[in-house]
Each structure stands twice: as C-alpha cells, then as structure tokens.
Amino acid sequence: MLKEIRPAIVLLLALTLLTGLAYPLAMTALAGVIFPKQAQGSLIEQDGQVIGSALIGQPFTEDKYFHGRPSATTAADPQDSSKTVPAPYNAANSAGSNLGPTNKALIDRVKDDVDKLKAENPSAAVPVDLVTTSASGLDPDISPEAALFQVPRVAKARGLSEERLRQLVSDHSKARLAGLLGEPRVNVLALNLALDAAK
C-alpha cells in the first residue's frame, strides 16, 4: 500500500515546497528588483518619516485638506468584541459596506453626505465618488471632478486662490492607464502633501 501512496506523498511535498515556498520567495525577490517602491508598499515619506502609502487612503477631515471617498471599513467594538464600530480606512479590515442600493441606512447616509457637500458648494453637482464607498473601503484616489468640487472650501480655509488650487489638482491628476484602463484620478495624500508644501 505504501508503494501506491508514495508517489502522491512525494508530489504533495514537492508541490508544497514549489508553490508554497520557492515561487513566493522568487516572486518577492523579483518584485524587489524590478519594482522596489511598489514591493515595499508604495510608502510615502516626509522628512525621513513614513506618513502613508500611495495605495491606501487616509481619513482627512479638516477643511484645509482635500477629502477622499467615504470608507465603510470597521473595527471591533472595544466594549463588545462581538460588534463592530466604524473605523475609516482600517487596512486590517478592508471591505465595503455590503449594503444594497435599496438599504435605508445606505440611502440615509448618502443623502446626509450629499446635503453636507451641497452646503459646502451649492452651485456644483456633487461628484458620486464623494458620497459612495469603494469596494475595499481603502481607495486612495478620487476623480479630478471630486477634487475640483472641494477647491472653494480648501481655498477659503487656506487663504489660497482657487486658480492656484485648480492648477495643483491638474498637476496631480493621472490619466487612464495606457489611455484605456481605469478612470482619471487624483491621489488624495499626494495632493494634500503638495498643498502643505504650497506657499
């Protein structure tokens, strides 16, 4: 019987070593050589200190900053671990809200967000990405339209001209990949860092 099972056991061990150890290590080493910044998480440093990643959004809430998309990520409730509490941009629990388009809680949240944004900029249409969460809850980018929508608020809070901020948004806008894939986008962290550097 061992004679019949032996090839299966040898194959299992060989494939486990190959796909579970050799392949991941080889790909990690290759990525480190070809894409060193991305392989380390696309970390953004300022004054030698890591302040974030270009791949994970952050919860900017002050008027002087551009805000990202809403985040539906959660964390364990400190009082009752069987429940969760909102924890925007919690990378340890990447997820969307899983609320359907007819869910009252989702509808109410979106309406509240639209009302707040309309109060901020009554003359412009609210871009959809400022009131909807991404599937991961960690999206670091917004559309150029969403950034431009926020220009009056940020200009007022910073005492900068709207024209200067529009140029900053334009400078940080990225086109579709290869002209086809994805949508035009602005990385919120990079834009806010440039905003802090602007005088």
UniProtKB/Swiss-Prot annotation:
<keyword id="KW-1003">Cell membrane</keyword>
<keyword id="KW-0812">Transmembrane</keyword>
<dbReference type="GO" id="GO:0005524">
    <property type="term" value="F:ATP binding"/>
</dbReference>
<feature type="compositionally biased region" description="Polar residues">
    <location>
        <begin position="71"/>
        <end position="84"/>
    </location>
</feature>
<keyword id="KW-0067">ATP-binding</keyword>
<comment type="function">
    <text>Part of the high-affinity ATP-driven potassium transport (or Kdp) system, which catalyzes the hydrolysis of ATP coupled with the electrogenic transport of potassium into the cytoplasm. This subunit acts as a catalytic chaperone that increases the ATP-binding affinity of the ATP-hydrolyzing subunit KdpB by the formation of a transient KdpB/KdpC/ATP ternary complex.</text>
</comment>
<protein>
    <recommendedName>
        <fullName>Potassium-transporting ATPase KdpC subunit</fullName>
    </recommendedName>
</protein>
<dbReference type="GO" id="GO:0008556">
    <property type="term" value="F:P-type potassium transmembrane transporter activity"/>
</dbReference>
<keyword id="KW-0997">Cell inner membrane</keyword>
<keyword id="KW-1133">Transmembrane helix</keyword>
<dbReference type="GO" id="GO:0005886">
    <property type="term" value="C:plasma membrane"/>
</dbReference>
<feature type="transmembrane region" description="Helical">
    <location>
        <begin position="7"/>
        <end position="27"/>
    </location>
</feature>
<keyword id="KW-0406">Ion transport</keyword>
<comment type="subunit">
    <text>The system is composed of three essential subunits: KdpA, KdpB and KdpC.</text>
</comment>
<keyword id="KW-0547">Nucleotide-binding</keyword>
<keyword id="KW-0813">Transport</keyword>
<dbReference type="InterPro" id="IPR003820">
    <property type="entry name" value="KdpC"/>
</dbReference>
<keyword id="KW-0472">Membrane</keyword>
<keyword id="KW-0633">Potassium transport</keyword>
<keyword id="KW-0630">Potassium</keyword>
<comment type="similarity">
    <text>Belongs to the KdpC family.</text>
</comment>
<dbReference type="Pfam" id="PF02669">
    <property type="entry name" value="KdpC"/>
</dbReference>
<feature type="region of interest" description="Disordered">
    <location>
        <begin position="67"/>
        <end position="86"/>
    </location>
</feature>
